[in-house]
UniProtKB/Swiss-Prot annotation:
One of its GO terms (cellular component) is cytosolic small ribosomal subunit. InterPro entries: Ribosomal_uS2 (IPR001865), Ribosomal_uS2_bac/mit/plastid (IPR005706), Ribosomal_uS2_CS (IPR018130), Ribosomal_uS2_flav_dom_sf (IPR023591). NCBIfam families: rpsB_bact. This is Small ribosomal subunit protein uS2. It comes from the Bacteria. SUPFAM superfamilies: Ribosomal protein S2. Pfam families: Ribosomal_S2. Residues 255-279 are annotated as: Disordered.
Amino acid sequence: MAVVTMKQLLDSGAHFGHQTRRWNPKMKRFIFTDRNGIYIIDLQQTLTYIDSAYEFVKETVAHGGSIMFVGTKKQAQESIAQEATRVGMPYVNQRWLGGMLTNFQTVHKRLQRMKELEAMEQTGGFEGRTKKEILMLTREKNKLERSLGGIRDMAKVPSAIWVVDTNKEHLAVAEARKLNIPIIAILDTNCDPDVVDYPIPGNDDAIRSAALLTKVIASAVAEGLQARAGAGADKAEAGQDGAAAEPLAEWEQELLAGATTAAPEAAAGEAAAAPEQSS
């Protein structure tokens, strides 16, 4: 069965690029035609690139890797959080903080501080303090949760990142490239394909297009988790050490059942509205 269908892509508006005056010439090979001043993306190529990205993500996760989901623009925030949470992967859907990848040791300290403040609040650690102190601590906790909540369980830099809009997320892209972390991303007609390892030509401005493609990547993660669990079970039965792939953590086991039930076909049911166009 196809990972995603041409009809799903069309219904989500994935074929609509930017206005012809707002484009990156490097994207020419991914463009089918232009209509009314809007570039139309070649969805046949999109399908091919989706298969390649899907396989890479699935294999990466199956061998113990993790995928960070990144999308801070309004059109992507909800789907990034929803799909990453569905498969237990880290995500950033608010502001990207410089150093999230290249200075992860410092970021990890901020994560520990966030968890410390949460524990204080839950165990009565705020009691006996002045109202001003409690207010300051609460504000600090809320700020940390807003900016770092999506990566709270990330113990190390991810194996790869999924990006919606490489132009907006240029800081994340630059950090990933500096660390040689593979980048999977939607490539709209104004993007630079040279900075992406696994491109998916498509509309990164339409809510439904971003949601559909993010769901595809999350489903690849889910399949990878399932393969990892199966490999671990096989090795346990054979009495082997299982060093090739990391076993599933408890939270991954809990997520697995629900994660594998949702598939990209769900996007077809959301196709009642007309395709959204890029501005």
